[in-house]
Design a protein with these regions (language model features):
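Acidic, metal-coordinating catalytic segment for phosphate/diphosphate chemistry
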Residues: 25-62, 68
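Short loop segments at secondary-structure junctions
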Residues: 46, 67-69, 78, 142-146, ...
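Short helix-capping/linker segments at secondary-structure and domain boundaries
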Residues: 188-201
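Conserved Nudix-box catalytic region and its N-terminal flanking loop in Nudix hydrolases
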Residues: 2-7, 13, 17-20, 52, ...
């Protein structure tokens, strides 16, 4: 069986048995510092076999940080694969064994310097279902206070303050195209209009959060 169960994976419905593809065997075709590329032989619903190539990803989180006046914290950073500076909400990948909320708190503090008192899990998205196991948990954060940030070596990030209306205008103009940020905006708009329910919690402060 596969050893790379994706974040957010759920059991298939029995009604979908006629669509299911079953694992036969796996081969690692590339392993870099970050990417793990697999080629799996799979059995199709009709009994024939074929291959699926995909990237194994540890999973990630994204934070929608809300100031008390309703404005939002965003980042601008250069994304080499698309060769442009992207406007995004803070995000980062999970460390091995790290709970998603711990990761969200860590990434927000490291990248922006902000800490949040209250957190709410908005949901999860799978952003590249044809070729990656990556799942991104989206968290809302409020009750922000600004401290110092601690960027990783080789990380260059500008932090800015904006509004949801401005982000929606940027998306409509085609200057904001990051999928996780677009989904976070959509869920935030729905939450503000009482169409997206979340549960707020007050976890221990970052330095008090137990490490796995």
């Amino acid at each position: 069986m596969r050893d790379d169960r994706p974040i957010g994976a759920v059991a298939d419905s029995p009604d979908d048995a006629h669509l299911r593809e079953d694992f036969v065997c796996s081969k690692q075709v590339y392993r870099g510092r970050f990417l793990d590329v697999r080629q799996d032989e799979i059995r199709l619903p009709d009994g024939n076999t074929t291959f699926r190539e995909y990237i194994v990803h540890p999973g990630a989180v994204m934070v929608v940080p809300m100031l008390d006046d309703g404005r939002l914290i965003v980042e601008r950073q250069y994304r080499y694969p698309v060769a442009r500076v992207m406007l995004e909400f803070p995000a980062g990948k999970l460390e091995l064994g790290e709970p998603p909320l711990d990761c969200a708190m860590r990434e927000l503090a490291e990248e922006t310097g902000y800490r949040a008192v209250e957190w709410a899990r908005a949901g999860i998205l799978h952003n590249a279902i044809a070729y990656s196991t990556e799942g991104i948990e989206i968290w809302f954060a409020r009750g922000l206070t600004l401290g110092s940030r601690s960027l990783d070596e080789g990380e260059f990030v500008d932090v800015d303050v904006t509004t949801l209306d401005a982000l929606e205008a940027a998306a409509q103009a085609g200057t904001l195209t990051d999928v996780k940020t677009l989904v976070g905006m959509m869920w935030l708009r729905a939450w503000r209009e009482d169409r997206w329910a979340v549960t707020w919690t007050r976890p221990p402060a970052l330095h008090e959060t137990p490490r796995a």
